[in-house]
Amino acid sequence: MTYVELHAHSAYSFLDGASQPEELAARAAELGYEALALTDHDGVYGSLEFAHAAKHLGVRPITGAEVTLADGSHVTLLVESARGYANLCRLLTAAHAHTRDTTSREPQPPRLDQALLEEQNEGLVCLSGCARDGLAVRDPNAAARLARAFGRDRFYVELQRPYERGDVRRNARLRDLAASLGVRTVATGDVHAHDRSRVGLQDVLVAVRCRTSLEGCERERRGNHESVLLRPEELLERFADCPEAVHETTQLAQRLEFDLTEELGYRYPDFSDGAEPASAQLRRVCEGAFAERYDDLNGHKRRVRRRLEEELALIDELGLAGFFLLHWEVLELAREVALEVRGPGSMRHVLPPGRGRGSSVGSLVCYLTGLSHVDPVENNLSLGRFLNRELASVPDIDLDFPRDIREKLIVRVVERYGQEHAALVASFSTYRSRGAIRDVGKALGLPYADLERLARRTDGWNAQRVAAEIAALPDAATKLRSPRWRAFGALCAEIAGLP
């Protein structure tokens, strides 16, 4: 193998990368890559999706991120070990900590203090950044400080050749910098699309990010179609004057052995103490509720007892007592918060602080611990969908909390478990038809009134049907004589599902 791409962006480099993680993985396999790094801007949102897809296709995934420093310059961080992944996540958390500045209504871009990166770099490899905004390009002295912090074996000067004005002069300066620091160079492609067919969409995404048209963001857009995943042989040709920077990518890739799909695991808190194991604590909670809810008046209690013993034995066998106790404890915290927020005299104090849903209602243990409001024995519900010996992962318990207690409950959970053991999980909006019509249409400079009429005609969901919706317009023949209207439908189909 002559080359490994160590700098690639997916659609999780929001409004910049134009390909889904699995598209990058598939293209890498097609081109014969042995490994590929995903380095999205200031996040690892697509890394697990990419890692699974790449491994399935025989490409070794490398985890990383392109991180923005406090001065606006970029460095590329690659993960070498599980410790490195932990440090990368901590650094990204710190970079995002002040993005919601209370003095501004607009979110601020992530920024990482270089001093923090110099302190928390164990298990990470640092490349000096991209051609436009790389740290070594913007501030060679700061790059030198970072090189000293990482050491010669974990800091590389990054060379890129996007075929823009100044390439030769910039790379000559960077090679001189590497020589003066005693570090090696690596070549990267700064990939923003898996294939040249997606370059037009990448231009549109930049326009959307800049809230303008394609003409209004010429300076921000890439000047050509070269920031795509290329054959390794093409990179060797591109860097014919410094082949060592190309070959160094394969040497470095061999060191980056961290596997996101295997090396991370989570174990729920054991809750055991010296006197009572977690399984005994869970039984105690269940027995207390059992005594309150069932009597000896009929045979139902015997059926419930058998079911309880079966579930507790299975939970003990799977080592999940801590899993159930954790959810129960969060629910108890919710009860405390609900009492504080609503007050004992409020009519709302009788409402449950939270309620489970989904397959967990089939569990008697969930019912007895308050995680579900449905008696599965009385309603003849099966446990198998929720919990069985063949489970590939932990079962799923969805707890819905009322809006009036949610904010205080989040604070209470963080206080209870600590900032290192509590996190908010984000979900991302993805493009559907109306959002695609409005954003892509604005980028192409299409008339606002026409876009609004078209948006109102659609079902609001499938952006891949926009071309068909255009063809159904009364003036479709006139519109489709315009190259921009013809491109519009295809671009909406390409942007469909992107975050």
Regions found by a protein language model. Name each.
Residues 1-499:
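Alpha-helical scaffold/interaction cores of sigma-54-like transcription cofactors
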